[in-house]
Amino acid sequence: MNDEASKQLTDARFKRLVGVQRTTFEEILAVLKTAYQLKHAKGGRKPKLSLEDLLMATLQYVREYRTYEQIAADFGIHESNLIRRSQWVEVTLVQSGVTISRTPLSSEDTVMIDATEVKINRPKKELANHSGKKKFHAMKAQAIVTSQGRIVSLDITVNYCHDMKLFKMSRRNIGQAGKILSDSGYQGLMKIYPQVQTPRKSSKLKPLTAEDKACNHALSKERSKIENIFAKVKTFKMFSTIYRNHRKRFGLRMNLIAGIINHELGF
């Protein structure tokens, strides 16, 4: 679907097919036009694909995760041309500020921390990426989200590791937040930040009481915001299916999508 065909769609259908709101698409397009004019101030050959169609093709790639060859055929250009120009779009948008903005936390903020996995093909050195628990190879992304839904930070590891180890490697300072909510993967976090709340664990000798179960249920309900954010990220099939590309661009792409989600939520 090119830009001309998308103009016939309703706003709701545009969002479902492209992955972003129409107003967001127009704002991103304005950023690209400014960057393109600066890059080609001295003129040059006119590209076969307009900026509107280039942005549409780039978003379709992340949203649908078809191959570049298939999308390039739809737009009537060569695969290598689309790859090169799509990568320019990704880098330009991130450098122009379409990413997660660094906003300091305050004592009034409640933040949630969690990690999600993205499957990858079996690598040559498979043990570094193997999840022994879930029996597949994966990369991990850790998000810190406020109770309003703003993504504060996003950290990526291309080698599979425990949630707490990823947090320590990220060196994120969230001590300014008034309350920190996490799942059982961050049991040691309360030794660093006393305001951390994690689920209460049971054992054979000490099963959970009714009060413990109620507290865990309330915590899970309060933490649902970060699960909703991960669901928004994974509407883009690049992050919900097996990631086929080079892993070095994975963090850039996920930060770009996280920045777009923040923007559409008003942050």
Where are these regions (language model features)?
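Charged, often Cys/His-bearing segments associated with DNA-binding zinc-finger transcription factors
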Residues: M1-G43, G188
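Short, amphipathic alpha-helical "recognition" segments used to contact nucleic acids or chromatin
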Residues: S50-E64
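Short, well-ordered secondary-structure "scaffold" segments embedded in the functional core
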Residues: L51, Y68-F267
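Short, charged beta->alpha transition segments
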Residues: G44-R45, T58, T99, K140
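Active-site-flanking structural segment that lines cofactor/substrate pockets
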Residues: K39-D53
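Short helix-loop boundary/capping segments at the starts of domains
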Residues: T34-L38, R63-T67, V91, Q95
